[in-house]
């Protein structure tokens, strides 16, 4: 057993609230006095349908989702949504637009380009413009008014970039399709500004295995009949999310996280905590006199994924190893970027961030 508290800074699957894990432990063999473990419940049983209903209603309340939006709990991860969004929403359109700001939006653009006859246009490219160290302002996006949609990722987990203000387009422009996997529920925004939102659960929602999709009802009219039902949003909605067996336990766990977030005071309260956590780390980096380096333009820095490095790769490796010995785990940066990455999603307590900042200062004292 570690001499230190264990703090999980993984980008995903990520830390879950301790209170949620405790509830899951207590209910592992007997959910709510039913005698059934959730993992062994039929997805069509009244017991599970109640879990699903409450999870959907709690998420709708937390995000203030309007009545004309449908919520789905699907499988396949956010990566599948790169394809599903294009397959469902681009049918009959000559073009759709994509904004590339980092690793995952780049992959989304590439995948969308393969699976539709619609031309996927680059509305903006942060790599070409800023070497992925800044974000192209929304007002500079080259959006075609008659495009099917505009796809973007609001937070880039690999590169440590995040739009300070959640992007929105003026009335009459194509609907926004947004990958919110690594920031959903971390700050307030208006769902009505978007046509479709999707998010893999394993960062801010729950364990891996479920993907949340929030889609405006009128867009479902676009879903073509010549794609497989399992990839058709309308098929899932027409069957109340039961087209195939959903990820029952991941949905149950996500529902527990929604209840936990409500108990914290909701999204507005957790947003203030997240702001303080990010500020703590960036002040440590900026106050290190160059020992720690974050090259992202300050206004584009992510509050969810803080990336940084030291002067050389060997020192970075030493940092990761020594941090883990003190219970600060999974800080190694993404393979294509290197350095370190501290993912500080909703469930990461402020104490964990402060422990990391203390370690960073001590490491600098010893090796600076």
Swiss-Prot record:
HAMAP family hit by this protein: SerC_aminotrans_5
Name of this chain's protein: Phosphoserine aminotransferase
A molecular function GO annotation: pyridoxal phosphate binding
Cofactor: pyridoxal 5'-phosphate
Note on how the cofactor is bound: Binds 1 pyridoxal phosphate per subunit.
PROSITE patterns recorded: AA_TRANSFER_CLASS_5
Family: Belongs to the class-V pyridoxal-phosphate-dependent aminotransferase family. SerC subfamily.
Biological role stated in the UniProt entry: Catalyzes the reversible conversion of 3-phosphohydroxypyruvate to phosphoserine and of 3-hydroxy-2-oxo-4-phosphonooxybutanoate to phosphohydroxythreonine.
Catalytic activity: O-phospho-L-serine + 2-oxoglutarate = 3-phosphooxypyruvate + L-glutamate; 4-(phosphooxy)-L-threonine + 2-oxoglutarate = (R)-3-hydroxy-2-oxo-4-phosphooxybutanoate + L-glutamate
Self-association and partners: Homodimer.
Gene Ontology CC annotation, any one: cytoplasm
Top-level taxonomic group: Bacteria
InterPro entries xrefs: Aminotrans_V_dom (IPR000192), Aminotrans_V_PyrdxlP_BS (IPR020578), Pser_aminoTfrase (IPR022278), PyrdxlP-dep_Trfase (IPR015424), PyrdxlP-dep_Trfase_major (IPR015421), PyrdxlP-dep_Trfase_small (IPR015422)
UniProt-listed Enzyme Commission number(s): 2.6.1.52
Species in which this protein is naturally found: Neisseria meningitidis serogroup C / serotype 2a (strain ATCC 700532 / DSM 15464 / FAM18)
One matching Pfam family: Aminotran_5
Main location: cytoplasm
GO biological process: L-serine biosynthetic process; pyridoxine biosynthetic process
Residues annotated as binding pyridoxal 5'-phosphate: 78-79, 104, 157, 179, 202, 244-245
């Amino acid at each position: 057993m570690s001499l230190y508290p264990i703090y999980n800074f993984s980008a995903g699957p990520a830390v879950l609230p301790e209170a949620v894990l405790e509830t899951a432990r207590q209910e592992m063999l007997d959910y709510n006095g039913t005698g059934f473990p959730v993992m062994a419940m039929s997805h069509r049983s009244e017991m599970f349908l109640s879990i699903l209903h409450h999870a959907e209603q709690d998420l709708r309340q937390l995000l203030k989702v309007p009545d004309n939006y449908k919520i789905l709990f699907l499988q396949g991860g956010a990566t599948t949504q790169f394809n599903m969004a294009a397959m469902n929403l681009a049918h009959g359109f000559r073009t759709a637009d994509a904004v590339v700001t980092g690793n995952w939006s780049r992959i989304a653009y590439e995948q969308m380009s393969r699976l539709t006859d619609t031309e996927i246009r680059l509305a903006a490219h942060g790599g070409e413009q800023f070497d992925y160290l800044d974000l192209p302002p929304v007002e500079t996006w080259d959006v075609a008014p008659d495009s099917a949609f505009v796809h973007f990722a609001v937070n880039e987990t690999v590169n440590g970039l995040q739009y300070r203000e959640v992007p929105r387009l003026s009335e009459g422009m194509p609907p926004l399709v947004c990958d919110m996997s690594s920031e959903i529920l971390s700050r307030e925004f208006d769902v009505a500004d978007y046509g479709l939102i999707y998010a893999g659960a394993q960062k801010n929602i729950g364990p891996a295995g479920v993907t949340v999709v929030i889609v405006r009802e009128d867009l479902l009219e676009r879903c073509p009949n010549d794609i497989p039902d399992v990839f058709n949003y309308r098929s899932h909605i027409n069957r109340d999310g039961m087209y195939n067996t959903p990820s029952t336990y991941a949905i149950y766990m996500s529902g527990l996280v929604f209840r936990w977030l409500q108990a914290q005071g909701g999204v507005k309260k957790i947003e203030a905590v997240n702001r303080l956590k990010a500020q703590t780390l960036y002040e440590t980096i900026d106050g290190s006199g160059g020992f720690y380096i974050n090259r992202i333009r300050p206004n584009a820095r992510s509050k969810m994924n803080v990336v940084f490095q030291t002067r050389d790769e060997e020192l970075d490796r030493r940092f990761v190893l020594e941090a883990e010995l003190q219970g600060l785990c999974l800080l190694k940066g993404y393979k294509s970027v290197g350095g370190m990455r501290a993912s500080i999603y909703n469930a990461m307590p402020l104490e964990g961030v402060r422990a990391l900042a203390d370690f960073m200062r001590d490491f600098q004292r010893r090796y600076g």
